[in-house]
């Protein structure tokens, strides 16, 4: 299997590359190396791994491959609220460029376009769970650019016949995640003997999925040759930010006195909750939050 990965030096992308190489698949990794990228990885000199430093909105050629999987994206909500230009360039124009490059290939050489999206495209809801059939109602510039990219992908399938997959992942956590995210920030604060900052009262609910479980779902979808469909990927662990911080603290024999409450964030959605039933039925996928957390922080 030949896989072209964009954003393979990032958090989720790097775990995907690692698993693909373990399977003996060949990887070409295109990444522009942002502040959150992994600059050095154990497989840099692997015989089946090729790295190309490039911006997906600017590349003009695609190597031949079976699947093009797009992890490349700006993803920090706070940054998108302060300045959305780079989000539009990477998350919309970058996807458009990749689709155009695929469209320019002869039909026999067109790869599956596997687009990694987010559960944030749905917006928030106070109860129940979103399914893949629900309307998209993004509520901040980041999620709006991801929703726009999805519309581009669907339009290129309908107009030009380009095969696609779209996954909408919930909050991922795990090794190599940049410290701006909640769980690595908790770990950093514990290491430095600082208090963990929790925005607002910590009651905002997120769905937490271990990154390796997420990657396993992506691999299953590829191996089962599923295409032209959309899947949520979520462990369905609906926990508040405060609960997650307390859970991490327990692993280090710390108590909630190590938490401090700070000003709320702009553009904060109250609750994200999506159903993964469609994915589970299609692939047999079965994640586990607590065991994932043990693997990560234990």
What annotation goes with each model-predicted range?
Residues 11, 36, 75, 177, ...:
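Short alpha-helical
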Residues 14, 190-298:
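C-terminal substrate-binding subdomain of Rossmann-fold SDR/epimerase-dehydratase oxidoreductases
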């Amino acid at each position: 299997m030949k896989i072209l990965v964009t954003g393979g030096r990032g958090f989720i992308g790097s775990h995907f590359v690692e698993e693909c190489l373990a399977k003996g698949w060949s990887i070409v990794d295109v990444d522009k190396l942002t502040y959150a990228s992994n600059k050095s990885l154990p497989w840099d000199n692997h015989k089946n791994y090729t790295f190309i430093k490039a911006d997906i909105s600017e590349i003009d050629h695609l190597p031949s491959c079976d699947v093009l999987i797009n992890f490349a994206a700006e993803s920090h909500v706070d940054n998108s609220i302060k300045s959305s230009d780079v989000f539009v360039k990477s998350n919309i124009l970058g996807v458009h460029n990749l689709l155009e490059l695929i469209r320019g290939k002869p039909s026999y050489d067109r790869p599956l376009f596997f687009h990694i999206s987010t559960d944030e495209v749905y917006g928030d809801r106070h109860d129940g769970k979103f399914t893949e059939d629900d309307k998209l109602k993004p509520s901040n510039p980041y999620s709006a650019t991801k929703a726009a990219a999805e519309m581009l992908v669907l339009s290129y399938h309908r107009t030009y016949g380009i095969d696609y997959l779209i996954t909408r992942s919930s909050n991922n956590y795990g090794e190599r995640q940049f410290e701006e995210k909640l769980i690595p920030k908790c770990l950093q604060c514990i290491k430095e003997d600082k208090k963990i900052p929790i925005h607002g009262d910590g009651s905002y609910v997120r769905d937490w999925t271990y990154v390796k479980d997420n990657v396993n779902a992506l691999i299953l979808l590829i191996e089962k040759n599923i295409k032209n469909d959309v899947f949520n990927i979520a462990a369905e662990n609906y926990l508040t930010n405060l609960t997650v911080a307390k859970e991490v603290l327990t692993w280090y024999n710390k108590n909630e006195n190590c938490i401090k409450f700070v000003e709320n964030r702009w553009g904060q959605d109250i609750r994200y909750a999506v159903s993964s039933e469609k994915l589970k039925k299609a692939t047999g996928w079965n994640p586990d939050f607590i065991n994932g957390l043990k693997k990560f922080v234990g």
